[in-house]
């Protein structure tokens, strides 16, 4: 199948059930007609102008998106209702069609992004070197502020734990202790990444990010297990807490202040894209939840029933284990070489084909996680009689374009003169 057809075949065959697409290719122009059956009626939607009303297009080796457009009605209504209410009020088939077109809109946006790289020679929105330095400085500031605040709040919560002797408050305090330990782990990771060593780490230290986060999350999940066991022991022993009014006021004041500070830090750290700073944001959000539960259960245990306090500690422990176990799984996936989603591979294919007229075939397009970003491997076929200098320049400029994408850490472009050979790499 010609590559022109392949790109849009991938683009169009993600349609919902009971939807049929006919594809016709005319030079570099691709026509697609959709037939959707809804409530017994059949109608036609032309995603591209028909031959009669379309302006003539010049023959070109490039994939052209100028004539492509989605229908004005995408099968879904956007009348301001919440997504939750639309889910129950909108017929299932209409929801599927609407979701399908939203996916196509996102894919078109990705293709337009690739077009921008072809036209301008660089990706839009890529920060300059000066902007990158300022961003790195602000990220380091966010890490230092978080660590210093965690130290101060830990001291305050130790006092609250001593005054209240609440298991839920103690669980929250132990969480703050581990915040300091985990903060040191993340700081060490970020600091190590800023010191490149081309001899020991020839492709950089970016994989230290997910490794540091996995260690961080593992320690937090271990804390949750310990608190769970201790709270269960208290429930079996039927041991409650006792506080006078002064101790209760001190505990409430400290825990409320800590929760407010953590909430503000969470909002601050969420504004960054760096994975380590966002891990701090997740930790601050976790502290807001655990502090709120710890305070509420401690006060309720004093006012009403003793068992509310260890029950609250168990809830905190379960939340801790679930949250950080999910974080571990997410970062493990980024280290094991998981393939990029089909939409991203389609963007890469579009970029590669439009790179140069002499590219006759695209043999391989592969992208997989290797840390927080993707490694990309591309095999392209050039004319066998092409000069080495010209072939090298085509491959090198394509590599530079691929590495401009924010999701790509490193790209490898392999040049060949035919595509009927056996696999060139060992597959385990």
UniProtKB/Swiss-Prot annotation:
GO terms of molecular function: monoatomic cation transmembrane transporter activity
Domain of life: Eukaryota
Location(s), subcellular: Vacuole membrane
Main location: membrane
Segments on the Vacuolar face: 162-167, 231-248, 309-311
GO biological process, one term: regulation of abscisic acid-activated signaling pathway
Pfam families: Cation_efflux (PF01545), ZT_dimer (PF16916)
Spans traversing the lipid bilayer: 141-161, 168-188, 210-230, 249-269, 288-308, 312-332
Membership in a protein family: Belongs to the cation diffusion facilitator (CDF) transporter (TC 2.A.4) family. SLC30A subfamily.
Name this protein carries in UniProt: Metal tolerance protein 10
Lineage of the organism: Eukaryota, Viridiplantae, Streptophyta, Embryophyta, Tracheophyta
């Amino acid at each position: 199948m010609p590559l022109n057809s392949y790109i849009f075949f991938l683009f169009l065959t993600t349609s919902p059930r009971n939807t049929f697409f006919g594809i016709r290719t005319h030079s570099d122009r691709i026509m697609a007609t959709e037939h959707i059956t809804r409530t017994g009626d059949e109608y036609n939607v032309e995603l591209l102008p028909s031959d009669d009303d379309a302006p003539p297009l010049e023959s070109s080796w490039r994939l052209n998106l100028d004539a492509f457009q989605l229908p004005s009605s995408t099968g879904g209504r956007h009348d301001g209702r919440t997504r939750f209410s639309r889910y129950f009020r909108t017929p299932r088939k209409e929801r599927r069609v609407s979701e399908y077109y939203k996916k196509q809109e996102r894919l078109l946006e990705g293709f337009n992004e690739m077009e921008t790289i072809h036209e301008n020679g660089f990706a839009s929105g890529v920060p300059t070197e000066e902007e990158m330095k300022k961003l790195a400085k602000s990220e380091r500031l966010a890490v230092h502020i978080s660590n210093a605040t965690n130290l101060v709040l830990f001291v305050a919560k130790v006092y609250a734990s001593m005054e209240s002797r609440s298991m839920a408050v103690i669980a929250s305090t132990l969480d703050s202790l581990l915040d300091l330990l985990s903060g040191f782990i993340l700081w060490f990771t970020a600091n190590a990444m800023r010191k490149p060593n081309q001899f020991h780490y020839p492709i950089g230290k970016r994989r230290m990010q997910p490794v540091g986060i996995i260690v961080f999350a593992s320690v937090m999940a271990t804390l949750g297990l310990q608190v769970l066991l201790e709270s269960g022991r208290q429930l079996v022993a039927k041991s409650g807490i006792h506080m006078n009014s002064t101790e209760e006021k001190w505990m409430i004041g400290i825990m409320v202040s800590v929760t407010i500070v953590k909430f503000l830090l969470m909002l601050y750290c969420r504004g960054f894209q760096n994975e380590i700073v966002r891990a701090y944001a997740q930790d601050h959000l976790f502290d807001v939840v655990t502090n709120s539960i710890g305070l509420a259960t401690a006060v309720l245990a004093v006012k009403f029933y003793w068992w509310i306090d260890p029950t609250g500690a168990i809830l905190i422990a379960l939340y801790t284990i679930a949250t950080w176990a999910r974080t571990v799984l997410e970062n493990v996936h980024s280290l094991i070489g998981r393939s990029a989603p089909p939409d991203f591979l389609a963007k890469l294919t579009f970029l590669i084909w439009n790179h140069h007229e002499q590219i006759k075939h695209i043999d391989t397009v592969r992208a997989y996680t290797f840390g927080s970003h993707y490694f990309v491997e591309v095999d392209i076929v050039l004319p066998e009689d092409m000069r080495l200098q010209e072939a090298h320049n085509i491959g090198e400029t394509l590599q530079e374009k691929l590495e401009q994408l924010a999701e790509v850490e490193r790209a490898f472009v392999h040049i060949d003169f035919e595509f009927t050979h056996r696999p060139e790499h060992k597959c385990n």
